[in-house]
A protein has these predicted regions:
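Alpha-helical transmembrane segments of multi-pass membrane transport proteins
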Residues: 1-424
Length: 424
């Protein structure tokens, strides 16, 4: 059964069929081969998405779309530019910093790409940066949208591996700040080497004025994350608070959202949420079938026999996930692989929260690597260029994130320090 499912999925990928449909067709083959009752299959698909923590996904997506339409993202850009825009290469640094701030409320890298990219990619091009480099920068920076909490992949890992989502969220700050800081340092040095960005400080608002204009926007991550870690509400409840706050600010404070806009915003959010839920439902059925066949246990035993220590295990997992992330959508990969790999990681004495950070950061790289990197498609859409034109420009950014991944992998305290401080 397992061989037939894998062969079907590989064939579907070769035919460029979407990931969700490929996994669904592979599961259908598995059902036919193993004579599983179709009613059980439907039940498993429904059970995969009928989980309270997953309700946070559509809420965070809606909050991100409200922020984009309501002027919050534009004010965050001006605030970030006031802080770092005065140096040579300040505009690319503004891009990274804004993505870090926006990530603290959106939970999605694609939402971050569109919300920030529509503002900053044209600005970068106007200031003389190559279009291909601007798109590569935005795609890479937006990866922080799923690393800095709240994060949709962290929610999925928490549900799949039965790990506290609150602990995962707070553990994400260390890796997120490391990657954000490394990207900012890289673009600062690169722009000086290339002689780019000498006029980036033009039109920059004073810090005080920019902070005042963005004060309502800046309060959003404070309220959401402060509420979670202060024990006021759960991550799922926080997502609903994010929607309410973004709607309130967009309608009544900044007044950039009209009631007529709500239909378009809701429609866009529903479509994005449905795509993710469809992936989760199909991946959940796939995971059920391979678990029923005993595949996780077989893989676990094999890994324990072949790999003799945690460091070797992490190295092998990183290599495998990097390749898997290029071809399989992040959500599907986490749902299928987390229940298999997390118990093995615990066997080797690796904290499940730390392992979650390794998985999320590694698979997030798949969002900026060809051929199926969703951030690349989003950034290229905004920049109006083809995907093949930015591949070479991506290499330095991928190298920076890979270097950070190695630090995150082998320095667990980077992820666990804040978690231990708050939860233990």
């Amino acid at each position: 059964m397992t061989s037939a499912m894998v062969l079907t999925m590989v064939l579907c990928f070769a035919l460029t069929i979407s990931v969700a449909v490929s996994i669904g067709l592979a599961s259908l083959v598995g059902i036919q081969v193993s004579n599983v009752n179709m009613l059980i299959a439907v039940k498993e698909m429904f059970s995969s998405i009928n989980k309270f923590p997953l309700a946070a996904i559509p809420f965070f997506i809606l909050a991100g779309n409200l922020m984009e339409t309501g002027g919050i993202s534009r004010r965050l850009v001006e605030f970030a530019k006031s802080l770092v825009g005065g140096v040579q290469g300040g505009l690319p640094m503004t891009c990274v910093l804004t993505c870090m701030i926006f990530a603290a409320v959106s939970g999605s890298s694609v939402a971050t790409t569109f919300a920030i990219g529509t503002i900053l990619i044209p600005a970068l091009i106007k200031h003389g940066y190559p279009t291909t480099w601007a798109a590569a920068l935005q795609a890479s920076s937006a990866e922080l949208g799923v690393i800095i909490p709240p994060s949709i992949p962290m929610i999925l890992y928490g549900v799949s591996a039965e790990v506290s989502i609150g602990e995962l969220f707070i553990a994400g700050f260390g890796p997120g700040l490391l990657i954000g800081g490394a990207l900012m340092l890289f673009v600062f040095v690169w722009c000086r080497f290339k002689g780019w960005g000498k006029s980036d400080g033009e039109g920059r608002l004073p810090v005080g004025r920019a902070t005042l204009q963005a004060s309502w926007a800046l309060m959003m991550p404070v309220i959401i994350l402060g509420g979670i870690y202060g024990g006021i509400f759960t991550p799922t409840e926080a997502s609903a608070v994010a929607v309410f706050y973004a709607l309130l600010v967009g309608l009544l404070v900044y007044r950039e959202i009209a009631f007529a806009d709500l239909y378009t915003i809701l429609k866009k959010s529903v479509i994005s949420s449905a795509v993710i839920m469809f992936v989760i439902a199909n991946a959940g059925l796939f995971a059920y079938l391979i678990t029923r066949a005993g595949v996780p246990e077989m893989i676990g035993v094999w890994l324990k026999d072949v790999l003799h220590d945690g460091n070797t295990f992490l190295l092998g997992v990183n290599a495998a996930l990097f390749v898997i992330g290029m071809f399989i959508e992040t959500s599907a990969a986490i749902i299928v692989l987390a229940p298999i790999l997390a118990p093995v990681a615990q066997f080797f004495g690796i904290d499940p929260v730390h392992f979650g950070m390794v998985m999320v950061v590694n698979l997030a790289l798949g969002m900026i690597t060809p051929p199926f990197g969703v951030n690349l498609f989003a950034a290229c859409t905004v920049a109006r260029i083809s995907l093949d034109r930015i591949v070479t420009q991506l290499l330095p950014f991928v190298a920076v994130v890979l270097s950070c991944l190695m630090v995150i992998t082998y320095v667990p305290s980077l992820s666990l320090f804040l978690r231990d401080l708050v939860y233990k």
